[in-house]
Amino acid sequence: MKGDDTSIEELLLQVGARDEPPAEMMLEVQAAVHAEWQSMLRARRTRRQFIAVGIAASAVLAVGVAFFGARYMAPSPVQVAQITRIDGHLLVRPQGQTARELAVAQSVSTGETIQTDDRSRAALQFGDQVSLRLDQGTIVKVASADELVLTAGALYIDSQAQNPQELTVRTDAGSVRHVGTQYEVRTHADDMVVSVREGRVMIANAAGTSSGVAGEEIRVTPRGEIVRGTVAAHDPRWQWAASTAPQFDINDHTLAVFLEWVARETGRKVVYASSAAQSAANGLKLRGSIVGLDPDTALNAVLSTTQLHRYQTKDELIGIALTSD
């Protein structure tokens, strides 16, 4: 190894020291290196800016999609009911818009809130199955085709179909779903009172689910307690709903059909004094109009034009007899 080291040393002595480059060349090299370095820095900054702009653009795009999606991709309102009667004034307030007055035969759509004042009542028809009536001072929102949100006043619902249309009424105290029935939902401060005239309802609140049947009045307290009472189908408290019933067109209907309508609206049952009286009611076609009359007043007016009359019987019955009976 020592010999090798000597040879290397001799070789270096022969070559001599490396010549230093001229000063001008050193300055040119340094300037070129500095320029290249600055170019690299600028390229990196440009890439970072592109990345930042890309991220910002993505964020703006996401916000835009969310905004316009919420505005333009939300479900469109759907017409779900038609106004069949207004006694006084009925206001409708579409979501995000000012209120306007409604008229009979106009429609109500999902997302709209309808309201009666302290002197007005109204009736709506949901499809072919459900009659909805609003008492005085009622505010209700049509949340969807099968859900109403009641914040003030009272609703009366009459569903006559064998397979009733689904409909849920929600209040602060709980919700009510019917199973083919006639019933009323009324708000009292934070309470909810459900009166069942016919059929059955299901009531749900924070405490659980319970049912109500015909003849029951169920009060749901803010604590979720259920307090039960009784109410007759012909009780005077139902009078407001009967007086707000959609107008019944008697033309070309038999007297028997009209009597059944009166019975349903007043919570009574029709009984005939004889088979002859029943046959006469089934065969008699009616003509005329009862517009503006409540069911009881209309009954008296119609019977006065026939050979039949109403006889005195129990409060829950409508007794019909021939004048000759």
Question: Would you name each region that the model predicts?
Answer:
Residues 66-325:
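A residue-level detector for the "anchor" residue at the start of short, highly conserved motifs
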Residues 24-37, 48-83:
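Single-pass transmembrane signal-anchor helices and their membrane-water interface zones
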Residues 2-32:
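A short, acidic loop/turn at secondary-structure junctions
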Residues 13, 45-47, 303:
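Class I S-adenosyl-L-methionine
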